[in-house]
């Protein structure tokens, strides 16, 4: 009996000891919340255009804002989504400038503007820190008077403030960058598609590597290469050769090596800067040898494809318009003419040639002409008929003003572009006037203006590749002609008056 009682007491004491021990164990600590700063400063600068990009242009749509995390649907939107999926991440918006008026029709950014917005970002980082990481949504083709490599300079200044924490950068496919940027940042991710469908995806990738790096699960190592090639934007579409094959090669490396990120920027040829041209940037998890091997492979491949880029030819204005009219007469409507070389938006070469060759049922979408808009607003209302000169004055390659005798079909504010006017003239012809360069990418642009684009014979767009999103890949366009009219965005890069680019870059200087 005593033995049984003893055993029971011993068992109870043993169980109590277990309960006591478990109760005394320290409650597991929750993983520390991660705090990441998010900023944006983005511009694609066509340095050959006549008008500098000033503070006034940057603040046309409003002053700098910290609300970028809630309003962005591209890189920052993807970054935010991935952070939410990981959990335990707090994002802090940093005072960032909005998009500049005129976009890439603006020339050199003034040093005053660059310093104002860079200093604003740096000051916010100082005052709102400390942070565990910094995410910068940049473009890569920014050009600033007096600052040769502005994005790299921005990242260096951020580094000086935040110290040795991860700085992750996203760039546009048209970026002009080199090792100075990758030396200052920890990881760089570049859009792989043109049209740029994957900005959201690149933001997600940036967040994944950022969080893994902060938690010690990833150690980003980079390799950067410059193949020494510049290419016209009109030939950089990733749905056609050779850009398609180059991007497929990059994706193949990523498939073979999980955790490796291979980025290619084809560059922006219309910025006269020292780091112009294609760039390859590879991020690996602590594997420099692999990063170097992949970067060398992609860079060498781009160099081997250089003549495919340079060998492409486009019809000049007269031939291109004749081809478009013939296609329309054959029933391949709507015919799309891509007036790709017009970088200021006010060129009249295609409009003038359409009229000269007797084209009907066409629409110019759009023609930049603030002067004509002001005159029409003063003298006319919707339904009024008038005669007015349009276009042909924005730059030396804008052509001649074209006299239009027509009717005001639409007059009003439209999609934050300012006052927009549609002039109807001739046999169902239209020209859409806007106060700034407008790149129409989808057919729904025409709907609020009362234009049924499907019923047009010919539609002229001031675009290079982005229009393919809504007119080619949807099957809307019967046929497309890219017309090489005079302008600051030509297919023949040897025609541009470069001063600052490398003296061995292909095809401008290096011929073999």
Where are these regions (language model features)?
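Bacterial N-terminal signal peptides that target proteins for export
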Residues: 2-12
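Bacterial Sec-dependent signal peptides at the C-terminal "C-region" and cleavage site
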Residues: 17-32
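N-terminal amphipathic/basic leader segments beginning at the initiator methionine
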Residues: 30-86
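Hard-cation-handling environments
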Residues: 34-36, 231-428, 432-434
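Active-site histidine-anchored catalytic micro-motif
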Residues: 37, 42-44, 48-50, 58, ...
């Amino acid at each position: 009996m005593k033995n049984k009682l003893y055993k029971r007491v011993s068992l109870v004491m043993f169980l109590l000891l277990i309960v006591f021990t478990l109760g005394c164990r320290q409650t597991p600590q929750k993983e520390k919340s991660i705090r990441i700063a998010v900023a944006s400063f983005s511009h694609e600068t066509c340095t050959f255009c006549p008008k500098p990009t000033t503070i006034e242009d940057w603040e046309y749509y409003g002053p700098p804002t910290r609300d970028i995390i809630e309003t962005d649907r591209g890189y920052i939107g993807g970054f935010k989504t991935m952070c939410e999926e990981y959990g335990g991440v707090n994002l802090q918006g940093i005072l960032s400038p909005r998009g500049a008026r005129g976009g890439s029709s603006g020339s050199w950014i003034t040093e005053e503007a660059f310093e104002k917005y860079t200093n604003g970002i740096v000051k916010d980082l100082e005052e709102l820190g400390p942070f565990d990481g910094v995410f910068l949504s940049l473009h890569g083709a920014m050009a600033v008077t007096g600052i040769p490599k502005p994005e790299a300079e921005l990242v260096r200044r951020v580094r000086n403030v935040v110290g040795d924490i991860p700085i992750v950068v996203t760039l546009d496919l048209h970026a002009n960058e080199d090792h100075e940027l990758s030396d200052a940042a920890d990881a760089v991710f570049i859009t792989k598609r043109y049209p740029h469908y994957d900005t959201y995806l690149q933001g997600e990738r940036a967040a994944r590597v950022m969080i893994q790096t902060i938690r010690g699960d990833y150690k980003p190592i980079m390799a950067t290469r410059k193949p020494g090639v510049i290419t016209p934007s009109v030939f950089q579409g990733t749905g056609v050769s050779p850009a398609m094959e180059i991007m497929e090669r990059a994706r193949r490396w990523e498939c073979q090596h999980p955790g490796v990120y291979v980025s290619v920027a084809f560059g922006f040829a219309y910025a006269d800067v020292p780091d112009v041209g294609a760039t390859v940037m590879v991020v690996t998890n602590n594997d420099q040898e692999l990063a170097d091997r992949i970067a060398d492979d992609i860079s060498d491949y781009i160099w081997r494809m250089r003549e495919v880029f340079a060998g492409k030819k486009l019809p000049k204005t007269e031939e291109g318009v004749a081809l478009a009219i013939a296609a329309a007469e054959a029933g391949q409507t709507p015919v799309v003419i891509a007036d790709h070389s017009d970088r200021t938006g006010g060129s009249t070469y295609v409009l003038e040639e359409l009229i000269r060759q007797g084209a009907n049922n066409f629409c110019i979408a759009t023609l930049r002409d603030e002067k004509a808009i002001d005159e029409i607003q003063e003298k006319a209302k919707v339904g009024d008929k008038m005669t007015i000169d349009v276009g042909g004055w924005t730059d030396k390659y804008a052509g001649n003003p074209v006299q239009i005798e027509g009717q005001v079909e639409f007059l009003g504010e439209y999609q934050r572009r300012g006052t927009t006017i549609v002039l109807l003239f001739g046999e169902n012809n239209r020209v859409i006037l806007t106060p700034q360069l407008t790149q129409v990418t989808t057919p729904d642009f025409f709907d609020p203006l009362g234009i049924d684009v499907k019923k047009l014979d010919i539609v002229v767009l001031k675009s290079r590749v982005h229009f393919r999103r809504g007119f080619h890949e949807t099957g809307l366009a019967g046929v497309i002609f890219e017309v090489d009219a005079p302008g600051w965005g030509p297919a023949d890069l040897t025609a541009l008056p470069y001063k600052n680019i490398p003296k061995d870059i292909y095809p401008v200087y290096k011929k073999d």
